[in-house]
């Protein structure tokens, strides 16, 4: 069997195309040859090459399954990520609708002030110029508007829970 090793190694390399994989295949082949008796009416060389080829086919199939399993796991992870992203979009849409509904329940002055500062991004000074009220009034309207929206959203969440 020792004299077959160089030929088996070349054959394994021709199957795998890689020296490291060829050496692994050669080792598996030799282990299998040593663990099973030689069948009757078969030459050692023919048997050794057949075992090497069968080991390569087994490894090829196993790699294919591993690659498919990795692709499936990757797809499931991406799918889960996609579902998580979709859940996030839905949650944001529901939250936006709740906030919009809560803003509609605010008194006109508070809704205008909150819209200018929180939605439009104006500073307190800019909002006070637009609404022609003191800066302190803007701050107090914002505080009351935020408190009312917070209470409305908390009560809606309690109903949903």
Feature names for model-found ranges:
Residues 113-117:
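A short pre-motif secondary-structure segment
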Residues 68, 125, 129-132, 146-161:
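C-terminal edge and immediately downstream basic/flexible tail or linker adjoining helix-turn-helix-like DNA-binding
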Residues 1-10, 14, 20-23, 39, ...:
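A short, charge-rich alpha-helical start-of-domain segment used by transcription regulators
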Residues 51-71, 92:
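Arg/Lys-rich amphipathic alpha helix in sigma70-family domain 2
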Residues 76-104:
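Acidic, proline/glycine-rich intrinsically disordered inter-domain spacer in sigma factors
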Residues 8, 12, 22-33, 127, ...:
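Short, small-hydrophobic-rich alpha-helical interface motif
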Residues 18, 123, 132-137:
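Helix-turn-helix DNA-binding motif, specifically the short coil turn and the N-cap/start of the second
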Residues 27-44, 62-63:
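Sigma70-family region 2
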């Amino acid at each position: 069997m020792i004299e077959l090793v160089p030929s088996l190694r070349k054959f394994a390399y021709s199957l795998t195309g890689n020296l490291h994989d060829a050496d692994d295949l050669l080792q598996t082949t030799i282990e299998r040859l040593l663990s099973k008796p030689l069948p009757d009416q078969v030459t050692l060389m023919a048997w050794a090459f057949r075992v090497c080829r069968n080991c390569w086919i087994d490894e090829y199939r196993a790699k294919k399954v591993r690659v498919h399993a990795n692709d499936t796991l990757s797809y499931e992870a991406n799918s889960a990520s996609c579902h998580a992203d979709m859940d996030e979009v839905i949650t944001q849409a529901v939250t936006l609708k709740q906030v919009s509904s809560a803003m509609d329940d605010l008194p006109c002055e508070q809704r205008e002030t909150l819209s200018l500062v929180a939605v439009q991004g104006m500073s307190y000074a800019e909002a006070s110029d637009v609404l022609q009220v003191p800066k302190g009034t803007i701050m107090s309207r914002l505080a009351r508007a935020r408190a009312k929206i917070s209470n409305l959203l908390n009560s809606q969440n309690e109903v949903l829970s």
